[in-house]
């Protein structure tokens, strides 16, 4: 059965630790089972802390994103395709590290 989730931007458009905590707490308090984040830069977000909080609250996590023009994997330019693949590799690793399965 599908879980009802909510995008983090419903609660906050930021990615500070306080904003993320508020997002997780509100999502959990209101009975959502999944929280979706736009791509989070692992150099700016404490991924271990976030993964731990997601587990503690019993939430699932998804990450959404789009690729920039210089990362278009359908491009005829191999360097642009390679950049897109690298971006996606980092995104998949982030989802994995957060304990999620949805990108």
Residue ranges of model-derived segments:
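N-terminal pre-domain/capping segments
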Residues: 1-100
